[in-house]
């Protein structure tokens, strides 16, 4: 077979199932001018933005005023400030239906809470569910190396080996690391504000609980020393010694 023929028969696409980390950005003002000013300020002091990470916009706090947003202009403003906007978080009821139509016209996906694309609503018959099986914790005994991702769906994640820089560990519940923790660690990824992260040493690039995060440069040397736990207190992450 010639090289030209081989190229013609080779697959041009490959679909792979993989989770990615998504930042949820809550919009608190419908004013594009106000949004632009705050983004300028946050870029100037280097805080608040994770440049390059996929971002989903949450409009729930705007209430009825979300209906009047110019989505295309808003998306352009965010992208001009380095926010990699991929879509909007789904809103309930009629507001959500109207938002979906306008979002798709602006080239934005509408995503539900767990990050998958929202399906059109339809009436369904609800039948009793069987009793759910107990969720088991995920135990990982091998090092999690750079570029690898481990996700404990529906439960806690327990690691007995180091998590390297560039790696990512996630759990719907708590994360326990009986070794140095580097890379990124995210507990309560579906919104469990009671989730916690426990580790022998905190050297991570990012640590988050229920979507509230702190970057490496926002963690003091004192908070890195020795075994610690990370928990959410109100809207802030607390890192304290064990």
Curated annotation (Swiss-Prot):
Keyword annotations from UniProtKB, A to Z: Cell cycle, Cell division, Septation
GO BP of this protein: cell morphogenesis; division septum assembly; regulation of cell division; regulation of cell septum assembly
InterPro entries (UniProt xref): CAP/MinC_C (IPR016098), MinC (IPR013033), MinC_C_sf (IPR036145), MinC_N (IPR007874), Septum_form_inhib_MinC_C (IPR005526)
The keyword Repressor is assigned to this record: no
Organism superkingdom: Bacteria
Record text on subunit structure and interactions: Interacts with MinD and FtsZ.
Homology family: Belongs to the MinC family.
Job of this protein: Cell division inhibitor that blocks the formation of polar Z ring septums. Rapidly oscillates between the poles of the cell to destabilize FtsZ filaments that have formed before they mature into polar Z rings. Prevents FtsZ polymerization.
Protein name: Probable septum site-determining protein MinC
Organism in which the protein naturally occurs: Thioalkalivibrio sulfidiphilus (strain HL-EbGR7)
Lineage: Bacteria, Pseudomonadati, Pseudomonadota, Gammaproteobacteria, Chromatiales
């Amino acid at each position: 077979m010639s090289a030209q023929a081989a190229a013609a028969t080779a697959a041009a696409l490959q679909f792979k199932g993989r989770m990615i980390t998504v930042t949820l950005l809550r919009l608190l003002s419908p004013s594009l001018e106000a949004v632009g000013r705050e983004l300028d300020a946050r870029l100037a002091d280097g805080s608040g933005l994770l440049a390059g990470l996929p971002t989903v916009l949450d409009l729930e706090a705007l209430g009825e005023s979300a209906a009047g947003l110019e989505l295309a202009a808003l998306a352009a403003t965010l992208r001009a400030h380095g926010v990699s906007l991929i879509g909007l978080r789904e809103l309930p009821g009629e507001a959500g239906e109207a938002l979906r139509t306008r979002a798709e016209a602006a080239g934005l996906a509408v995503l539900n809470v767990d990050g998958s694309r929202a399906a059109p609503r339809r009436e369904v018959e609800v039948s009793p569910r069987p009793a759910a099986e107990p969720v088991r914790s995920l135990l990982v005994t091998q090092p999690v190396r750079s570029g690898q991702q481990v996700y404990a769906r529906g439960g806690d994640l327990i690691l007995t080996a180091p998590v390297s820089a560039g790696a990512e560990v996630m759990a719907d519940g708590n994360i326990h690391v009986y070794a140095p923790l580097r890379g990124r660690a995210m507990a309560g990824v579906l919104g469990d504000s009671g989730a916690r992260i426990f580790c022998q040493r905190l050297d991570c690039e990012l640590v988050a609980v229920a979507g509230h995060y702190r970057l490496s440069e926002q963690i003091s040397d004192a908070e890195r020393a020795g075994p610690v736990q990370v928990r959410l207190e109100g809207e802030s992450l607390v890192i304290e010694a064990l």
